[in-house]
């Protein structure tokens, strides 16, 4: 639905906005398309710009942290945490990429990143996991 020119300009504007914080294409080359929707064309455009297309690993429900109680697909933070831990118990999480949103609707009062993320990190560390930068995980 977008042209290559629009796509490239949008990416470049994003990096310009992030530059004051030291974030550059060189040190943060990862691209997760909005809503995780992409096709071969978007993948090729991203690759030609030096971007590495990534997506979260399905099955943990981590990405549901944006949902609100009024949505049919709503998942509470307790439910998300339990789903992740159950996935870890049944299959393990080595190599999994989880998506947590940095901000959510005011309608969602149990924000995973403020109420459960710390607990998840501590629990996974206790279970022997270590967290590494994405650059080390996929290269």
Briefly describe each language-model feature range:
Residues 1-99, 103-125, 129-130, 135-139:
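Catalytic domains of cell-wall/extracellular-matrix polysaccharide-remodeling enzymes
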């Amino acid at each position: 639905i977008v042209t290559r020119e629009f796509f490239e300009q949008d990416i470049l504007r994003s990096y310009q906005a992030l530059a004051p914080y030291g974030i550059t294409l060189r040190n943060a080359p990862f691209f997760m398309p909005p809503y995780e929707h992409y096709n071969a064309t978007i993948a090729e455009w991203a690759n030609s710009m030096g971007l590495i297309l990534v997506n979260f690993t399905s099955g943990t429900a981590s990405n549901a942290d944006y949902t609100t109680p009024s949505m049919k697909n709503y998942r509470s933070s307790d439910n998300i945490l339990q789903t992740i831990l159950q996935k870890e118990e049944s299959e393990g999480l080595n190599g999994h990429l989880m998506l947590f949103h940095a901000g959510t609707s005011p309608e969602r009062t149990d924000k995973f990143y403020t109420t459960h993320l710390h607990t998840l990190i501590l629990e996974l560390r206790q279970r022997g996991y270590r967290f590494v930068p994405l650059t080390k995980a996929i290269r």
